[in-house]
């Protein structure tokens, strides 16, 4: 499917595509199952959304920012800006992952979230 061929390199890291072919297959299936009108709507909504950095600047609570080392859509440099905008932020960069970190590296993401929550709320 040409839509998946275009989207996959922006969603998954090269490492994921090479070493975890099942992940790529699952994402391809999800893209194929998504109606074209929905994909179009999502693309327009993302293009029109306002900058969220002011929201982070105004938020008084703790923030966890998780980003894939090879995220082509929201690169680590943007994640760093998010973390810097927040009053209290933790930035976690997931090695060898792209934009879909919970799918590409679920154990790393789950550990980062559980440790972050435990440090703040236990």
Language model: regions and residue ranges:
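Structural signature of beta-strand start/N-cap positions in the alpha/beta core
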Residues: 55, 62-64, 87-90
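Short alpha-helix in the alpha/beta-hydrolase fold that links the catalytic acid
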Residues: 61, 75-84
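Catalytic active-site module of serine/aspartate enzymes centered on a nucleophile-bearing elbow/loop
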Residues: 87-122
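Generic recognition of short, well-ordered alpha-helical segments
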Residues: 22, 54, 77-81, 104-108
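Conserved alpha/beta-hydrolase catalytic His-Asp/Glu region
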Residues: 2-58
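Hydrophobic "lid"/C-terminal helical patch
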Residues: 7, 43, 82, 109, ...
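Short beta-strand/loop motif that positions the catalytic acidic residue
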Residues: 59, 65-67, 71
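Glycosyltransferase donor-binding loop in the core domain
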Residues: 31, 71-74, 98-101
């Amino acid at each position: 499917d040409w839509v998946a061929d275009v989207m996959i390199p922006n969603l998954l890291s090269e490492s994921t595509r090479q070493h975890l072919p099942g992940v790529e297959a699952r994402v391809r299936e999800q893209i194929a199952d998504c109606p074209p009108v929905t994909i179009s709507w999502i693309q327009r909504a993302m293009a029109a959304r306002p900058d969220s950095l002011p929201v982070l600047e105004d938020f008084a609570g703790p923030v966890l920012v998780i980003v894939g080392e090879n995220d082509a859509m929201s690169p680590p440099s943007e994640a760093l800006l998010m973390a810097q905008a927040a009053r209290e932020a933790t930035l976690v960069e997931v090695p060898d992952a792209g934009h879909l970190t919970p799918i590409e590296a679920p154990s790393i993401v789950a550990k980062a979230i559980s440790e972050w929550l435990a440090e703040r709320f236990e």
